[in-house]
């Protein structure tokens, strides 16, 4: 993993822009199960554009966006100079934190802050069918989501389908919780019983295993 260099002593890593998100996940998991990073789950997505767009990940509710956790960059400007945070203006570094891929120059590497993850992490995907049921679940979640603990990541994918002469919609609810299955069931039973989550729907393991489950790899 020559595109990802981890320093556990400082809880930091240097990521070359050529690295994919999958390589970041893999490189980190080979060194530690105690730390992760708030990035997306597309394993083939390039980290350079991902970081420069700001981007949101499974740990973002607790730790912020990807670039909220970038501490330094190696950046080539319009004059061909290779700059780091110390040698560029601070407003340029600020602009690089989510200002858009390629807008301010070329980022060749970024120094990131690793963030703590729990020893056990639970993920689940639960599908529901039916316009009425899904409408009620989504309406309910709008009231719950802002108050949910930051350890809980959630997203839902809604798509239409046709089976025979019947056209309907299906919603897939994806969640990741920094905790055990028992803790996840207790939380969801308290704040979102309408989802009817059961232990059979959950997969508990290390953080990287939860990421792989949600990414479906």
Predicted regions and their residues:
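C-terminal cap/substrate-recognition region of VAO/PCMH-type FAD-linked oxidoreductases
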Residues: 73-217
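FAD-binding glycine-rich core of flavoenzymes that anchor FAD
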Residues: 1-95, 104, 133-151
């Amino acid at each position: 993993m020559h595109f990802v260099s981890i320093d556990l002593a400082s809880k930091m890593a240097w990521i070359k822009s050529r690295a994919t998100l999958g390589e970041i996940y893999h490189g980190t998991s080979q060194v530690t199960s105690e730390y992760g990073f708030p990035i997306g789950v597309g394993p083939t997505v390039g980290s350079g554009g991902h970081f420069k767009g700001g981007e949101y990940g499974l740990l973002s509710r607790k730790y912020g966006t990807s670039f909220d956790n970038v501490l330094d960059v190696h950046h080539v400007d319009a004059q061909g100079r290779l700059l780091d945070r110390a040698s560029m203006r601070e407003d340029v570094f600020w602009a690089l934190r989510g200002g858009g891929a390629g807008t301010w120059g070329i980022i060749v590497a970024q120094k990131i802050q690793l963030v703590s993850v729990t020893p056990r992490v639970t993920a689940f995907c639960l599908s529901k069918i039916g316009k009425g049921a899904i409408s009620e679940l989504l309406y309910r979640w709008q009231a719950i989501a802002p108050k949910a603990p930051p350890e809980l990541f959630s997203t839902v994918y809604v798509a239409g389908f046709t089976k025979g002469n019947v056209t309907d919609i299906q919603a897939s609810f994806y969640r990741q919780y920094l905790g055990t299955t028992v803790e996840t069931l207790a939380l969801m039973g308290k704040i979102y019983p309408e989802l009817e989550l059961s232990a059979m729907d959950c997969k508990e393991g290390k953080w990287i295993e939860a990421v792989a489950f949600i990414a479906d790899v």
